[in-house]
Amino acid sequence: MVVTGASSGIGLAAAVALARAGDDVVLLGRDPRRLADAVSRVRDAGGRTPASYRADFSVLDEVRAAGAAIAAAYERIDVLANNAGQLTSVRRPTADGHDATMQINHLGGFLLTHLLLDRLQAAAKPQVPARIVTTSSLAEAWGTLDVDRPGRRQISRWLAYGASKQANILTTVEAARRWTGLGIVATCFFPGLIRSGFGRRSPAFSVARFAPGLFRSSEQGADTLVWLATDPDALVPGGHFAWRAPFPATGRSTDPARAQRLWRSSLAAVEQG
């Protein structure tokens, strides 16, 4: 099971839970020191040292290198958890020419998924499909995503984050249409408001800090990810979940026509296909 954004937050919490349950986990993270700490925590939980790979999703060549290394190391991948994400204040385009938030939160994971697609398909069995689980957010509701130009610079980091979360859900919708027949089930989920460094930078924190009961731990946020990665009842192609239950998303984030347009433009943006 490959988990991106695994060096902290819900990615790390999910990796620990999966390892504790006996699963072989592969960690992908950006910061070498935090990634090393995550390896130690996952090893303590599962009794085995997990493989780890470093990649900064704001640099697509690093994603390509990590994807190639993982594909070379594993003949099959049962689960890909696309959890890497960032609410970045960087307003300049990445070296690849894209909005930084959109590249980190959408295009990087989209590229990695395609690089590992053969390994996911190799793991698929008639009654036990491979799975792609993507972390979404309520922020999709305020996104201003241009599905024909996903890397277009957004006017604020909040709108960029919302657009990237729209893209996550739309990609799940189209992945389900394309890949369910290959034995790959794509789902996504909203983890809730998380008590972490990432969560404290969200616009909801200014309100939620006065009602601390609204915030959840990283472990609680990761629960639905782990469920979607492992439970037979979670095999709902294109499903959007929260708290282990179906969770509605806006029409803009679930429109099949928009999903297909985004898929085509994203392939061009990451130079795939």
Language-model-detected regions and their locations in the chain:
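C-terminal helical subdomain
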Residues: 209-249, 256-258, 264
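Rossmann-fold cofactor-recognition segment
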Residues: 44-61
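Catalytic loop of short-chain dehydrogenase/reductase
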Residues: 85-93, 98-102, 121-182, 190-205, ...
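Conserved glycine-rich Rossmann-like NAD(P)H-binding loop of the short-chain dehydrogenase/reductase
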Residues: 21-37
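A glycine-rich helix->loop->beta "capping" turn
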Residues: 45-50, 69-82, 88-93
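Conserved glycine-rich cofactor-binding loop
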Residues: 7-9
